[in-house]
A protein has these predicted regions:
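Well-ordered, non-membrane alpha-helical segments in soluble/globular domains
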Residues: 1-5
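Membrane-embedded transmembrane helical bundles of large multi-pass transporters/channels
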Residues: 7, 11-187
Length: 187
C-alpha cells in the first residue's frame, strides 16, 4: 500500500526511497516462512507417501494414510480462515505438528488393522479400535491437555498456538480412528 502510494506521488521526481523498519522486516520474514512452509510440506508429503508405500506395500493403503494429515491440515487452515486468525511465527508451525502427529496416529491404526485383518476380517475394525485405538486416543488427549496449557498465556499468539495445536492433535486422532478402519476394512 505504502509502496504504491509513494510510487504514484514521486513518479515525476528524482527522489529515490526505500521502505524499511521492523514492520517490513517482520512482513518479509513471514513471507519467507510461508513460502518455505509450503515447499517443506510438499516435500514431506511426498517423502511420507513413498515411505508408506514401502511400509504397507499397497498404493491404496498409503493413499488413505497420507490423506489423513492432508485433511487435518486443511481443517486447521480452514478454521484459521473462518476465525480470521493470521499466519504468524507461532501459527505457521501448526501444520508441521499436525502432519507429524496425524501420520503417527494413522500408521498405528492402519498397521493394527492390517494385522487384525489377517486374524479375522469380521472383527478387525472393532479389535483395532479396542487395542490401538485406545492407545492413540489416550496419547492424543494427553498431548491436547499439554497444548491447552498455552491457552493460559497473556500473549495472544501463544494462546492461539495452544488452542490450534490442541485442535490439530484432536482432529488427527479422530480422523485416524474414524476414517482409516472404515475405509480400509471395506477394501
Amino acid at each position: 500500500f505504502i509502496d504504491n502510494y509513494l510510487t504514484n506521488k514521486l513518479s515525476n521526481t528524482n527522489i529515490d526511497y526505500q521502505i524499511s523498519g521492523l514492520g517490513v522486516l517482520y512482513n518479509n520474514l513471514l513471507q519467507s516462512l510461508f513460502s518455505s512452509q509450503i515447499k517443506t510440506l510438499s516435500f514431506v508429503f511426498i517423502a511420507i507417501f513413498l515411505m508408506l508405500l514401502v511400509l504397507f506395500r499397497s498404493f491404496f493403503t498409503a493413499l488413505v494414510v497420507i490423506f489423513i494429515p492432508c485433511i487435518a491440515v486443511g481443517m486447521i487452515f480452514t478454521t484459521m480462515s473462518m476465525f480470521s486468525i493470521p499466519l504468524d511465527i507461532m501459527t505457521i508451525t501448526i501444520a508441521s505438528i499436525s502432519v507429524g502427529m496425524s501420520v503417527d496416529y494413522a500408521i498405528h491404526i492402519a498397521w493394527r488393522l492390517k494385522e487384525e485383518q489377517k486374524k479375522s476380517s469380521e472383527s478387525a475394525e472393532k479389535n483395532t479400535i479396542y487395542s490401538s485405538g485406545q492407545a492413540v486416543l489416550i496419547t492424543a488427549l494427553t498431548i491436547v491437555i499439554g497444548f491447552l496449557v498455552f491457552s493460559f498465556s497473556n500473549f495472544n499468539p501463544t494462546i492461539l498456538f495452544g488452542l490450534l495445536s490442541a485442535l490439530s492433535i484432536y482432529l488427527s486422532a479422530e480422523l485416524s480412528l474414524r476414517l482409516i478402519p472404515s475405509i480400509l476394512n471395506t477394501k
